[in-house]
A protein has these predicted regions:
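Acidic/negatively charged segments and metal-coordination signatures
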Residues: 1-2, 97-106, 110-244
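Compact alpha/beta protein-protein interaction domains typified by the UBC
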Residues: 5, 10-115, 126
Length: 244
């Protein structure tokens, strides 16, 4: 059931949206959920190259908004399906945790649009005109997850990332244990803050799914590596049950 509080929040936030993007409108879908639909136009430049474009978009607002970010679809057919598209046809604005953390900094529709949606659309428009991505491009799938977590945690080793994801997947943060990065410090004095922040933005089950994706990817690359010590307890328990 859609709360009146959510409706009032969206009405208030749409004032800033319509001031900048007057062709975007708040609507209520047949299932009762709120969506923002319409044309979004912009003109900007990078490295002296001017880009002016307009896209038809649909932003779906979750019932848990603003604790959870919206998702966006491009509905005008300008962007091909193979350009950063998720399996549910929403557009991939980044790694899920990355999107959630960015949104939480300013949990409003206008900041979501200007901080995440417009940069995505600008990247497509720029790529269409000039043939390269203006902000670089993260790999897709598990390789992109691995790349993001290395950047977030400031580490380079693949197995270290799996070690951190194991802690998050098991919801097993203990500040007094050695940090998986190998620097010799306990977790709370090393990467504790990053893990606590990540844990605040994503469920353990989502981290488990990411661990599985990264693990499968790494096994293909290095099947003989020693993965002991970085396997979530939930995976170990399931493996033991199957072995009995």
């Amino acid at each position: 059931m859609i709360s009146d509080e959510l409706f009032q929040t969206l009405l208030q936030q749409m004032k800033a949206v319509r001031a900048l993007f007057p062709d975007l409108c708040l609507e209520q879908a047949e299932d009762g959920r709120f969506v923002v639909r319409g044309s979004l136009g912009f003109q900007t430049q990078r490295d002296g190259k001017v880009v002016e474009a307009e896209y038809e978009i649909e932003i779906n607002i979750p019932d848990t908004y603003p604790q959870s970010p919206p998702v966006v679809r491009e509905t005008g057919g300008k962007i091909p399906e193979d350009f950063h598209t998720n399996g549910d046809t929403t557009r991939c604005l980044g790694v899920p945790l990355e999107v959630r953390m960015r949104f939480s900094e300013h949990a409003t529709l206008i900041h979501y649009l200007t901080g995440q949606v417009v940069p995505f659309l600008f990247s497509h428009a720029y790529f269409s005109l000039y043939g390269d991505m203006p902000f670089g491009e993260r790999p897709h799938g598990a390789a992109g997850l691995l790349d993001f977590y290395k950047e977030l945690l400031g580490v380079e080793q693949d197995l270290v990332v799996l070690g951190f994801l194991r802690i998050l997947a098991d919801d097993d943060y203990k500040g007094h244990v050695p940090c998986p990065c190998g620097r010799g410090l306990i977790l709370r004095k090393c990467h504790g803050q990053q893990l606590r922040e990540a844990r605040d933005h994503q469920r353990a089950s989502d981290f488990l799914n990411e661990w599985i994706a990264v693990f499968k990817y790494l096994v293909e690359q290095a099947p003989n590596a020693d993965y002991r010590g970085v396997v979530p307890k939930r995976i170990m328990k399931a493996h033991r049950r199957r072995a009995i």
